[in-house]
Amino acid sequence: MKFKKMLTLAAIGLSGFGLVACGNQSAASKQSASGTIEVISRENGSGTRGAFTEITGILKKDGDKKIDNTAKTAVIQNSTEGVLSAVQGNANAIGYISLGSLTKSVKALEIDGVKASRDTVLDGEYPLQRPFNIVWSSNLSKLGQDFISFIHSKQGQQVVTDNKFIEAKTETTEYTSQHLSGKLSVVGSTSVSSLMEKLAEAYKKENPEVTIDITSNGSSAGITAVKEKTADIGMVSRELTPEEGKSLTHDAIALDGIAVVVNNDNKASQVSMAELADVFSGKLTTWDKIK
């Protein structure tokens, strides 16, 4: 009888401990859901940042100038991988990346109730979308022109869709190799570079004597490199400004959405465009304010 009583008391003790533990866990979850928002942004010159701030209205025009009102407290990352890592490691973080680079390590929020997907980008329902452009000068080599022809071909656009991006060209023709040789330098957007690596790999299977060097350092850097003739082709993950496009030819190689991402433990599932602008400009600073 005494032994049975001791077991009962032990069970009550464990049960109490469990309730305390659950209570603490619940409190932690609540704290995570209502904590201070950690804004993760891309660097100045990033095409993803340029497109994101323009679409959300964070980028304001003041006469001939454009003012980026991204929160001064934002943690700046210089690559897509940097944003993914920062969001994955912080329960209260929020960032933005290329939809084609989205992995299961983070969670994408719906925007105004619309999920980011190939279909919602194609039909225009998903508001955060942009083209992946390439730029080149009028004196581009025969090899460079052939590589661009491959990108726009049936085989090239198949590489685009195989890598979770959206094809820019619906009417395409078969690419026929001319068995060229030589070297190309492609510079620019970190969002475009992962796709460009796959395109270069597929092109080199058709042209084994070709070397393609790819440098990921931001859209603006890609445009500058082509203008300064230190690169053959530039990668740009946004629309070009009239000034940028003056002396260059550009064309879209793919379409892409911009996914707004949070930690997988975050309870939020959607955000409005208005809330998004307020979050990334520093006006809305806690998760409990997002409805």
UniProtKB/Swiss-Prot annotation:
Intracellular or extracellular location(s): Cell membrane
Residues in the signal sequence: 1-21
InterPro entries in alphabetical order: PBP_domain, Phosphate_ABC_transporter
One CC-aspect GO term: plasma membrane
Keyword Chloroplast found: no
Keywords, in A-Z order: Cell membrane, Lipoprotein, Membrane, Palmitate, Phosphate transport, Signal, Stress response, Transport
SUPFAM superfamilies in alphabetical order: Periplasmic binding protein-like II (SSF53850)
A Pfam family annotated for this UniProt entry: PBP_like_2
Membrane topology according to the record: Lipid-anchor
Membrane-crossing segments per the record: none
GO biological process: phosphate ion transport
Lipid moiety-binding residues (S-diacylglycerol cysteine): C22
N-palmitoyl cysteine lipid sites: C22
PROSITE patterns hit by this protein: PROKAR_LIPOPROTEIN (PS51257)
Primary location recorded for the protein, binned into one broad class: membrane
Induction text: By phosphate starvation.
The keyword Transferase belongs to this UniProt entry's keyword annotation: no
Function description: Part of the ABC transporter complex PstSACB involved in phosphate import.
Entry's family note: Belongs to the PstS family.
Note from the entry: Overexpression seems to confer resistance to penicillin.
Record's subunit section: The complex is composed of two ATP-binding proteins (PstB), two transmembrane proteins (PstC and PstA) and a solute-binding protein (PstS).
Identification of the protein by name: Phosphate-binding protein PstS 2
Origin species: Streptococcus pneumoniae serotype 4 (strain ATCC BAA-334 / TIGR4)
Gene (name only): pstS2
